[in-house]
């Protein structure tokens, strides 16, 4: 998997990291090519030892609706086939796992992820509404201006009408967003088979009482400070003064909202 440059996504990602006062929103959208090379080919050969690429793997029911899997036993289209019957090929499953590995490396390794940790979403409109509701409830009016820009950029990159949409819903032990204070999170894959491309949209909300941007900034400052001291010892030069920039915040106008 190769991360594809996208200036529109970079601009949007800067607006998806938001401190709301009571929570911290961290989101990103990334585009990946499914063309395998190098390590991907080696990993794919190992992956195929457990089954051929065309073999279908059973997926878990979608969780977009907020209902538990047991309450999603039947689809709207009929009584015989429900979300539990959703499947994908092992090759597609490999693409999803490889995308996670590329996006979260080096902090996490998803090589042992299994098909039951993924779901195929029922429709584009369902996913769009779920994303919109999560982000609008978090940042309110500020998301109204970002929403059309966000979805237009995704559509231009991946052609949403042609996509199969998957989500990653792991157990707490495997969830990279399962830390204390996590309020909600989502991980969506927009897969266009024709383009051989995946757009990965990941976002989480962390309680402000358990996570502060300054903590990450202090850790970075300590690392940089140690490097500066080492350089000074080697060169005998003086250090430069500086400090972390204040994180950008969105306007905090909070009103109740109901997503339709």
Curated annotation (Swiss-Prot):
> InterPro entries in the record, alphabetically?
Maf1 (IPR015257), Maf1_sf (IPR038564)
What Gene3D superfamilies does this protein's entry cite? Repressor of RNA polymerase III transcription Maf1
Q: Where is the composition biased (Basic and acidic residues)?
A: 251-260
Biased amino acid composition, Acidic residues: 218-235
Q: How is it modified after translation?
A: Phosphorylated at Ser-60, Ser-68 and Ser-75; the major sites of phosphorylation. Nuclear accumulation correlates with a concomitant dephosphorylation. Phosphorylation may attenuate its RNA polymerase III-repressive function.
Q: List residues modified as Phosphothreonine.
A: 64, 212
Which Pfam families did the record assign?
Maf1
Of the GO CC terms on this record, one is: cytoplasm
State where the protein is found.
Answer: Nucleus; Cytoplasm
Could you list the residue ranges that cross the membrane?
none
Composition skew (Polar residues), residue ranges = 61-76
Segments carrying the region annotation (Disordered) are 58-85, 211-260
Q: What is this protein called?
A: Repressor of RNA polymerase III transcription MAF1 homolog
Protein source organism: Bos taurus (Bovine)
The gene name on file is MAF1
